[in-house]
Amino acid sequence: MATRILRTFDELKSNSQTGLITYLTAGFPNQDLCLDIINELSKSGSDLIEIGMPFSDPMAEGPIIQQSSKIALDNGHTMELTFDLIKKFRTKNSQTPI
């Protein structure tokens, strides 16, 4: 069985299209708004949504992602909450690759 990501790339390729891949930090600016943003990204045409896990020492990331990680962690975001966020998204959208 092909994954959602592979199916999306195959479909884009077969239609000679490029895809829109969006990124956000889980839990930023807070859990509820993050879920709203993910839903809107999907509705607005994002072909794939990358959700970054906030990390306390994101040295490989640029300043914007570092700051969003800090804010998410300062608000109490955890890895478990990231998985909860994705589960909530999946209850309404089973197709958009994450």
Describe every region a protein language model picked out:
Residues 62-98:
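Alpha-helix-loop-beta-strand connector modules within alpha/beta enzyme cores
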